[in-house]
Amino acid sequence: MKLPLKYENKRKGLEFISEKTRYKILLTLLASENPLSFSRLKLILSSIPENSLNYHIKILKENDFIKNEKRTEYKRSEPRSFYSLSQRSIDLLESLGLTEVKEEFQALFEQMT
């Protein structure tokens, strides 16, 4: 039996974000009030090696789970690239009920930062 397309897409999304590092990145972005730079993500998710974090961010971007905003006006010492959730991620996390507990994630996020 073939699943209807909307359920197949959801299944693929669930499979994709079930990878632990990607899940942590998405929940961190969900908890953040603002987009986060790579250096900020690296600081918050310090248990994840930098090359692994970079790899999973790349995969999340390529599959439209996160957005990458590049700022054109910046000081040399400031980050230029910031990450936030895409609508695809928001929809998936919402369907899982995770956006309903955003305040809890934000409280955890505040403790981590």
Question: Model-predicted segments: where are they?
Answer:
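Residues within the DNA-recognition helix of helix-turn-helix
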Residues: 56
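Amphipathic alpha-helical dimerization/coiled-coil segments
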Residues: 2, 7-9, 87-113
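Residue-level detector of family-conserved "landmark" positions at structurally sensitive sites
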Residues: 39, 52, 70-71, 103
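Short, intrinsically disordered/low-complexity patches at protein termini
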Residues: 49-50, 59-62, 91
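N-terminal helix-turn-helix DNA-binding core of bacterial DNA-binding proteins
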Residues: 12-48, 52
